[in-house]
């Protein structure tokens, strides 16, 4: 399946001028005149967007510089050109003798489809113009239809099979080419192309059914529930939107200070919906049928092939050991929260599932006096971008420059385009920063691959292009965009993904950048969170936007310590979700209903009681995009923690460690087995116990001592 590896992952310095950064630019890349279009990155983000003269009068380029996409109709042209080229490449693949050229042709075929599909995948949700969104949606459907045809093209499959079946020829290929060939074959076989015609037809039908069920389930996860006003006490009704004689419950209201509001929202929002329950059951059983049809014992076995964990047994071992190590800490967290609830609400002091987010926040605020608004003046967006610039420059020799955009290149006038430039290698790629709030914009922070990097036949390198989407407030006339500590951490997180895309400079776009196993893809982004919480890094950029005063060390220390409050209970909740995901995608038919399984798993892996007549699993949207892989965030965090402690804790600006990180981890994208990359970075092969210990030990870090030692 040629688009399988293209799945998106469902989170700053002026002075050292462009001349120094461009000194190493040679050959063709120097022909482009860059000196007049690059500017310091911090300044570009601390000013309100303007309709610049060059933007109004300059050459019209189309979205992302694609000439056809200056109008919505251009998507039709782009997809027709892609489909025409696809047919030609299929003929080439089928007529070329088996060898390395086979893999190159397959990768070009994948690139041809992904360049339209990935771009359209972003535009269909990110563009403010409905005409562009609809045209992009149609392009996605058109490319998807072509992919289905290729998935059932036996001649194309056999051309790859001839290569993989020749042991001597495979041994002559380099490791990356072998892996990419095997990944293409894996993508084919999970769609059932190796089966007889009847089973192949069943596999195609199941794939279509799973896609439809996934879309239906995902859509309903956010549907509000209604209840008659008369059924709720009058004094809490104003917390909910009204619809005539009904109240609309559209979420859990987890931060509401009134216990009764949280309880009502929890019980009503999570009340079972029969259609959604049936949809989930059909989705899980269809996934299981497809997995068995193509040769796997469970969907989880199929989904975990090629990951760090490799098998469901390893995942459950990881989750069980982590749960065991967390259990005592979690009990203490729950006891502390119950004490706070008793203090504030003596009449109803039992801790319930709707309580932890609120009471952990109360404890955090009381103990550390963390008021986000006190931090914001020190964290202007421009300052944070300069901080990233300093960090990337010291660690990797990379500088970010703001680059002018042409008319039609961006979808909103507040988009910033960054050129990512290495001190000796030159231009590495582009990051489009869609950072600011606007109507109908998706609320989740995301990283999108628009174009993957690859080595082209003429010897030049196709530069990667990505979009980072955040939801930050706009600058005003009086002050720039100011970030809360949480926003700043999210910015660093998403920039971790972007750097992975820029530095995962593989020969093949099928494995470029973040196109890697899910439990490895979050490692670079989570690692950036550790940098964002280190005072030595923060002190480089966190200065008051008016006075220039640095953010006091004590404030950073308090913030970091506050993040450890109730972290065991929060992580225990994630373990519960991950275990539930594994059980749902394990042996079928399921022994009990999904709700009974939820109740048992919650009792085993969480500790707070199941609430009768609720079905939280029907709101678990990650079952669609992260089916059997929800554990990935925990495992990625464990790996990132180990890398931080082993390589960057002593010196977060260590250039040798930064270069090793690039060489061993980022450079391979998905072109190398993830455990081999981790082993190369850590100089050892970590065990499940090592992963568990890394996560638990994070809760012990004495940041106060650490900051004092770093003077």
From Swiss-Prot:
Zn(2+) binds at residues 493, 497, 500. It catalyses: Release of an N-terminal octapeptide as second stage of processing of some proteins imported into the mitochondrion. Pfam families: Peptidase_M3. CDD domains: M3A_MIP (cd06457). Its EC number is 3.4.24.59. Its cofactor is Zn(2+). Coiled coil: none annotated. Activity is divalent cation-dependent. It is stimulated by manganese, magnesium or calcium ions and reversibly inhibited by zinc, cobalt and iron. InterPro entries: M3A_MIP, MetalloPept_cat_dom_sf, Neurolysin/TOP_dom2, Pept_M3A_M3B, Pept_M3A_M3B_dom. The keyword Protein biosynthesis does not apply. Keywords: Acetylation, Calcium, Cobalt, Hydrolase, Iron, Magnesium, Manganese, Metal-binding, Metalloprotease, Mitochondrion, Protease, Transit peptide, Zinc. Monomer. This is Mitochondrial intermediate peptidase.
């Amino acid at each position: 399946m040629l688009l399988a590896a293209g799945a998106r992952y469902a989170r700053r310095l002026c002075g050292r001028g462009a001349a120094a950064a461009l000194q190493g630019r040679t050959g063709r890349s120097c022909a482009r005149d860059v000196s007049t279009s690059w500017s310091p990155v911090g300044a570009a983000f601390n000013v309100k967007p303007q309709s610049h003269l060059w933007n109004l009068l300059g050459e019209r380029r189309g979205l992302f510089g694609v000439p056809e996409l200056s109008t919505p109709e251009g998507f039709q042209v782009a997809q027709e050109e892609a489909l025409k080229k696809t047919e030609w490449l299929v003929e080439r693949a089928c007529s070329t003798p088996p060898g390395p050229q086979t893999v190159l042709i397959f990768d070009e075929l994948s690139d041809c489809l992904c360049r339209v599909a990935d771009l359209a995948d972003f535009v269909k949700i990110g563009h403010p113009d409905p005409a562009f969104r609809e045209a992009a949606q149609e392009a996605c459907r058109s490319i998807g239809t072509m992919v289905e045809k290729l998935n059932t093209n036996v001649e194309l499959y056999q051309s790859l099979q001839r290569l993989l079946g020749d042991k001597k020829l495979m041994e002559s290929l380099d490791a990356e080419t072998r892996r990419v060939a095997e990944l293409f074959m894996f993508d084919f076989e999970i769609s059932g192309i190796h089966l007889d015609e009847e089973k192949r037809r069943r596999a195609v039908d199941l794939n279509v059914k799973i896609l439809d069920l996934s879309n239906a389930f995902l859509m309903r996860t956010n549907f509000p529930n209604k209840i008659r006003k008369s059924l709720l006490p009058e004094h809490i009704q104003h917390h909910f939107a009204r619809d005539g004689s009904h109240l609309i419950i559209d979420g859990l209201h987890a931060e509401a200070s009134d216990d009764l509001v949280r309880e009502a929202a929890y019980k009503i929002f999570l009340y079972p919906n029969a259609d959604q329950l049936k949809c989930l059951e059909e989705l899980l059983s269809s996934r299981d049928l497809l997995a068995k049809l193509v040769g796997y014992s469970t969907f989880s076995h199929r989904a975990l092939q090629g990951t760090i964990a490799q098998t469901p047994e390893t995942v459950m071992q990881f989750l069980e050991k982590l749960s065991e190590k967390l259990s005592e800490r979690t009990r203490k967290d729950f006891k502390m929260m119950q004490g706070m609830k008793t203090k504030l609400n003596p009449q109803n002091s039992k801790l319930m599932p709707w309580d932890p987010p609120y009471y952990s926040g109360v404890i955090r605020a009381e103990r550390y006096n963390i008021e986000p608004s006190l931090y914001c003046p020190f964290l202007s967006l421009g300052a944070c971008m300069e901080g990233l610039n300093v960090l990337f420059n010291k660690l990797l020799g990379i500088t970010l420059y703001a680059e002018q955009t042409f008319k039609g290149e961006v979808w909103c006038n507040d988009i910033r385009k960054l050129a990512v430039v290495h001190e000796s290698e030159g231009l590495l790629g582009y990051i489009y920063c869609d950072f600011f709030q606007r109507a109908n914009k998706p609320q989740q922070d995301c990283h999108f691959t628009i174009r993957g990097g690859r080595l082209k036949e003429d010897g030049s390198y196709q530069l990667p292009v990505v979009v980072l989407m955040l939801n930050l407030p706009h600058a005003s006339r009086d002050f720039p965009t100011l970030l809360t500590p949480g926003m700043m951490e999210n910015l660093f997180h998403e920039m971790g993904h972007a750097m992975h895309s820029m530095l995962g400079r593989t020969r093949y776009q099928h494995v470029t950048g973040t196109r890697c196993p899910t439990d490895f893809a979050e490692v670079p982004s989570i690692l950036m969170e550790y940098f964002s919480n280190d005072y030595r890094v923060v002190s480089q950029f966190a200065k008051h936007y008016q006075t220039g005063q640095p953010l006091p060390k004590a404030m950073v220390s308090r913030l970091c310590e506050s993040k450890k409050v109730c972290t065991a209970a929060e992580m225990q909740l994630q373990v519960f979700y991950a275990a539930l995901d594994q059980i749902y995608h394990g042996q079928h038919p399921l022994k009990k209903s999904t709700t009974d399984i939820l109740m048992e798993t919650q009792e085993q892996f969480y500790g707070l009681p199941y609430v009768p007549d609720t079905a939280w699993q029907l709101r678990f949207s990650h079952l669609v995009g992260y089916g059997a892989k929800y554990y990935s965030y925990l495992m990625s965090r464990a790996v990132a923690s180990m890398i931080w402690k082993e390589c960057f804790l002593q010196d977060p600006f260590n250039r040798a460690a930064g270069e090793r990180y690039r060489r061993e981890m980022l450079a391979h994208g998905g072109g190398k087995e993830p455990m081999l990359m981790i082993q190369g970075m850590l100089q050892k092969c970590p065990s499940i116990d090592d992963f568990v210990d890394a996560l638990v030990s994070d809760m012990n870090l004495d940041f106060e001592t650490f900051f004092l030692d770093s003077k």
